[in-house]
Amino acid sequence: MVKNIVDLYTRAVASFGETLQHVSLDSWEKRTPCDDWTIQTLVVHVLSGEVQLMNLVEDETYSSPELSPNILGPDPMSTWRGTAINAIRVAQDTPLGKELPHPTVTLTLERLLGARITDNAVHAWDLSQALSLNH
């Protein structure tokens, strides 16, 4: 049973990671259902969202996300796992009502987690479609 939004976030991140495990080295340039996005573009987008969550909570700064493939490093799955684990830890250790800096909206951790849940869940499905997996 899901107790709270942090549990939902953890499950959404895990779902994306489980799907990401199926990406082979020759799959990164495959198209996704997202217009003009490859698997690599999609993974960079989701990964940078988790990095942004940590920046907003820990550093209390908003910066434009890094959308370069370089963010994936030499082992994208290891990069994902480490980033996901750290983002989940930050979410678990931070009060949901904490206000976060953002240039356009009043943002709390709870609202940000709602957005991250949606992003991970939707893009796990997009990724599964690009890989011809059932999701």
Predicted regions and their residues:
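An N-terminal domain-cap segment
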Residues: M1-W37
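Amphipathic, well-ordered alpha-helical segments in soluble domains
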Residues: A12-T19, G49-Q52, T83, D119
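Amphipathic alpha-helix face/heptad-repeat signature
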Residues: I5-A12, P76, W80-T83, L112, ...
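Surface-exposed helix-capping loop/turn segments at secondary-structure junctions
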Residues: H22-W28, D93-K98, L133
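Short, helix-capping/interhelical loops that line the mouth of catalytic, cofactor-
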Residues: M1-N4, V43-P103
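Short, contiguous alpha-helical
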Residues: S27-P65, T104-H135
